[in-house]
Design a protein with these regions (language model features):
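N-terminal cofactor/phosphate-binding cores enriched in small/glycine residues
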Residues: 14-67
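Fe-S ferredoxin-like electron-transfer domains
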Residues: 48-49, 57-185, 194, 199-203
Length: 204
C-alpha cells in the first residue's frame, strides 16, 4: 500500500494512504480525545471530539484521510474551544456523578474531561439536578443505565454485525438505547458491554 508522510503536532509520521488522521495518530501513540471510536468499527464521527486542525481548518480526524505533506494540530485555541463546548454539553446531559460509578477509572468521558481540564467544580455547575432515568434491567445478561450513556452508538454498531438486537429510541436529548428485554434477539455475546466507553452497560 502507498505511504504518505505528514506531521502531527510537529512529529513526522508515515501512514498508509488509505488511513485517517485519527488512525495515523492512534498508531503512533498520539492521543486524540474520542468517545465513538472502536478499532474494528467503521468510523462514525458521532461524538466529534476527535476534531483537529489541518492547515487552519477544523476537521473530524476519524473521517478525514491523510495526505502527503499534511500538517495536523491536535490542539489549537479553536479546537480546544469547540471540544470544550461539546464535552460540556455531554456532561450537562450525563445525569450521573462519577463517584461510585462502576465505569469510573477506565471511563473515556473522564479521560476526555481530564484532557480538557474540566474540574469537579465545573462539573457540578454543568449538571443541574435532574430526575434520574430508570435503569433498564430487562435483559438477562446486562443492565443499561441511560443516565450514564453518551450515545456513542458503539454498542449499536457492534451488534449490527452480530444480531441487530439494539436500537435507538427517542430523539435529541430524549434519545436512548433500546435493548428490548426478554423479547430481544440478544445472544449474550456481551461485546456491547465490553466495548462501552463509560459505565452505561454492566454485566449482571
Amino acid at each position: 500500500m502507498d505511504k504518505v508522510t505528514l506531521k502531527i503536532d510537529g512529529l513526522e509520521v508515515v501512514a498508509d494512504k488509505e488511513t485517517t488522521i485519527f488512525q495515523a495518530a492512534h498508531h503512533n501513540g498520539i492521543y486524540i480525545p474520542h468517545l465513538c471510536f472502536y478499532p474494528d468499527l467503521m468510523a462514525s464521527g458521532i461524538c466529534r471530539l476527535c476534531m483537529v486542525e489541518v492547515d487552519g481548518k477544523v476537521v473530524i480526524s476519524c473521517r478525514t484521510p491523510v495526505e502527503q505533506g499534511m500538517g495536523v494540530r491536535t490542539r489549537s485555541p479553536e479546537v480546544d474551544k469547540l471540544r470544550r463546548i461539546l464535552i460540556e454539553i455531554l456532561v450537562a446531559n450525563h445525569h450521573s456523578t462519577c463517584r461510585g460509578c462502576p465505569g469510573s477509572g477506565p471511563c473515556a468521558l473522564q479521560k476526555t474531561m481530564g484532557y480538557i481540564c474540566i474540574d469537579r467544580g465545573r462539573v457540578r455547575k454543568l449538571r443541574p439536578t435532574k430526575e434520574e432515568l430508570p435503569e433498564d434491567n430487562l435483559n438477562p445478561f446486562f443492565n443499561y443505565d441511560p443516565n450514564k450513556c453518551v450515545l456513542c452508538k458503539i454498542c449499536l454498531h457492534t451488534c449490527e454485525r452480530i444480531q441487530s438486537a439494539i436500537n435507538v429510541v427517542g430523539r435529541g436529548c430524549n434519545a436512548k438505547m433500546a435493548f428490548f428485554g426478554d423479547s430481544s434477539k440478544c445472544e449474550s455475546c456481551k461485546e456491547c458491554v465490553v466495548r462501552c466507553p463509560v459505565g452505561a452497560l454492566m454485566e449482571t
